[in-house]
Swiss-Prot record:
This is Large ribosomal subunit protein bL32. One of its GO terms (biological process) is translation. The keyword Ribonucleoprotein applies. Pfam families: Ribosomal_L32p. InterPro entries: Ribosomal_bL32, Ribosomal_bL32_plant/cyanobact, Ribosomal_zn-bd.
């Protein structure tokens, strides 16, 4: 016979949500940092720098 599952506590729910948000914040910071380095021209690992094309 079907038995209802136990309800997840608010503390557990909030803990999981906080962990997910923390991971999302870290990834957003990484993306922002990469975007800044691309715009300032400091990222030779994403796009080859113009000096390499002269050869």
């Amino acid at each position: 016979m079907a038995v209802p599952k136990k309800k997840t506590s608010k503390a557990k729910r909030d803990q999981r949500r906080a962990h997910w948000k923390r991971k999302a914040t870290i990834e957003a910071q990484k993306a922002l940092s990469l975007g800044k380095s691309v715009l300032t021209g400091r990222s030779s690992f994403v796009y080859p720098s113009p000096e390499d094309d002269e050869e």
